[in-house]
């Protein structure tokens, strides 16, 4: 089995236009990381509120610099528009984010981080969730133009430069 390990989430879609089509053609699956956009898609970060103490967004060792791109009021407000979608399906925001990623036929698996066993139990349930085309469209509508899609952002820096 050959796979690629790119970043991929409802907010970070840079692999969709070039990597995914080529991978499908060549029989390469995706084992994606950051399917919940560093926790942003869990809904725990709220517009107008400070990030919870001890969260990834407040801890430099856990990637506070990396997550900062998603900590704008615009992004957090859009993500909260996904809550009624999750509620309507009787699933958590985390499960919705993971199910969205796993809906891509080229995604073989998703690497998720968890700080508690309960998070693992909750997130594993996403593997059995199938989202309808209407739900997928509702997620796209909620996020609007926010998802990053520029394939140039998928390039690795040249180590010899």
Label the model's feature ranges.
Residues 15-57, 92:
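Aromatic-lined glycan-binding groove of carbohydrate-active enzymes
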Residues 1-18:
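Glycine/proline-rich, positively charged
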Residues 4, 23, 30-33, 82, ...:
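Conserved, mostly hydrophobic/aromatic
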Residues 1-5, 29-31, 108-111:
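Structural preference for beta-strand elements that scaffold enzyme active sites
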Residues 94-97, 109-113:
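Conserved active-site loop/cleft motifs that coordinate metal ions or position small ligands
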Residues 7-11, 35-37, 115:
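Active-site beta-loop-alpha junctions enriched in small/polar residues
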Residues 25, 49-89, 103-108, 115-161:
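Terminal-tail/helix-coil boundary detector
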């Amino acid at each position: 089995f050959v796979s690629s390990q790119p970043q991929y989430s409802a907010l970070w879609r840079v692999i969709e236009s070039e990597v995914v089509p080529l991978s499908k053609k060549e029989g390469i699956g995706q084992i994606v990381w950051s399917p919940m956009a560093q926790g942003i898609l869990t809904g725990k970060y709220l517009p107008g509120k400070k990030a919870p103490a001890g969260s990834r967004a407040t801890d430099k060792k856990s990637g506070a610099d990396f997550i900062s791109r998603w900590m704008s009021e615009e992004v957090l407000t859009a993500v909260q528009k996904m809550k009624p979608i999750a509620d309507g399906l009787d699933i958590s925001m985390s499960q919705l984010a993971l199910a969205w990623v796993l809906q891509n036929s080229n995604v073989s698996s998703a690497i998720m981080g968890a700080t508690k066993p309960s998070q693992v139990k909750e997130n594993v349930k996403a593997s059995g969730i199938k989202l309808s085309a209407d739900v997928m469209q509702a997620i796209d509508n909620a996020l609007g133009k926010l998802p990053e899609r520029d394939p140039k952002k998928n390039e690795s820096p040249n180590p010899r430069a």
